[in-house]
């Protein structure tokens, strides 16, 4: 399986301080859909047909682009002679015109949208629009897993409280699929260090989240990716999954809106190893790409001494250690191991 993030633009109609892109301050460029399709065709010819392409439309905000361009790329993705999946990440703070609504509900396998503490909703009207759009899509799709809510783990979000978050966001909007992502300090987050939690705060939060889920018996009702990544390690001995999967630089491509190519979308505007005009062979053998793969593969020395390495695998290499240690929720993992 290859994950392919296609950035339709580098800009957005919002300014979230945690965002790994740069919000409305991002470059005012839009994708060249013919070059995107040509690149996908090259990749399709190069890779084995039994390898699935999981394609996600990203930005900035994908739906500030022309709908005819979105439909053209969707047509091309579905025309490939292999198994494909097409989804989108979108802020849902815009009018759901009939053509947008049709594209989302008829052409995509699902969408991811975010709810965050600071900057995400600048007015009460924006929040109400977001909630209204979610309900509209839910009513049409009748699929509880179609919409995934993602929230970035910032200091303000931690202070907001788990119970309040579930009551005011998850339960209120009938959400059944969600994730809480660890913050990586890229893009706008570089300019806002006050929102970055310590790694101990991250570990403590996920332990408390697990306790909340256990107390309210929520695992049967809501899929929470960040916890499922941990649970399946213990229950199914499946170690390489989610953010603990240290092969992102090998199995992931991000096509920036200006036509440059990277891997991890969090650092895609700067960690570039080629362009869509390059051959796939040239991209794969790029010294910069090989260096990024090497960076991801090599663990900090301390990891090799840890008794949980087999479960953690070192974690996402974009998550740096601080004076409080790493971000892996060790207390939670140890308790789950002891219960098996």
Model-derived regions, located:
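Cysteine-centered iron-sulfur cluster-binding motifs in ferredoxin-type domains/subunits
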Residues: 8-15, 61, 303-305, 309-310
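Radical SAM/AdoMet-radical enzyme domain recognition
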Residues: 4, 25, 37-56, 65-198
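A C-terminal junction/extension of Radical SAM enzymes
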Residues: 186-270, 309-311
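Short Fe-S-cluster ligation motifs
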Residues: 42-59, 326-340
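Active-site metal-binding loops of divalent metal-dependent hydrolases
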Residues: 60-62, 92, 251
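Conserved, mostly hydrophobic/aromatic
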Residues: 12, 16, 57, 259
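Flexible mid-to-C-terminal extensions adjoining Fe-S/redox cofactors in radical SAM and related proteins
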Residues: 260, 266-340
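Canonical Radical SAM [4Fe-4S] cluster-binding loop centered on the CxxxCxxC motif
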Residues: 1-35
């Amino acid at each position: 399986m290859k994950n392919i993030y296609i950035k339709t633009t580098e800009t957005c109609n919002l300014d979230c301080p945690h965002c790994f892109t740069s919000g409305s301050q991002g470059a005012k460029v839009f994708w060249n859909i013919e070059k995107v399709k040509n690149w996908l065709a090259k990749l399709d010819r190069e890779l084995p047909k039994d390898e699935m392409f999981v394609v996600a439309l990203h930005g900035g905000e994908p739906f500030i682009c022309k709908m005819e361009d979105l439909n053209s790329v969707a047509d091309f993705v579905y025309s490939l002679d292999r198994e494909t999946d097409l989804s989108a990440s979108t802020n849902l703070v815009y009018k759901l015109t009939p053509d947008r609504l049709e594209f989302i509900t008829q052409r995509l396998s699902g969408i991811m949208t975010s709810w965050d503490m600071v900057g995400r909703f600048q007015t009460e009207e924006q929040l109400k629009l977001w909630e209204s759009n979610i309900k509209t899509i839910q009513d049409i799709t009748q699929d509880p897993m179609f919409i995934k809510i993602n929230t970035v783990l910032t200091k303000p979000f931690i202070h907001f409280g788990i119970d309040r978050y579930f009551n005011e966001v998850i339960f209120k909007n009938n959400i059944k699929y969600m994730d809480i992502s660890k913050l990586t300090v890229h893009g706008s987050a570089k300019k806002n260090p006050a929102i970055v939690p310590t790694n101990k705060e991250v570990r403590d939060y996920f332990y408390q989240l697990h306790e909340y889920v256990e107390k309210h018996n929520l695992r049967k009702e809501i899929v929470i990716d960040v916890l499922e990544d941990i649970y399946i390690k213990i229950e199914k001995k499946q170690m390489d999954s989610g953010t603990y999967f240290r092969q992102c630089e090998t199995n992931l491509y991000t096509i920036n809106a200006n036509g440059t190519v990277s891997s991890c979308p969090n650092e895609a505007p700067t960690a570039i190893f080629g362009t869509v005009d390059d051959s796939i062979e040239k991209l794969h053998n790029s010294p910069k790409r090989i260096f990024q793969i090497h960076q991801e593969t090599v663990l900090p020395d301390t990891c090799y001494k840890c008794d949980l390495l087999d479960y953690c695998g070192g974690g996402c290499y974009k998550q740096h250690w601080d004076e409080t240690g790493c971000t892996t929720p060790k207390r939670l993992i140890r308790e789950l191991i002891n219960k098996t």
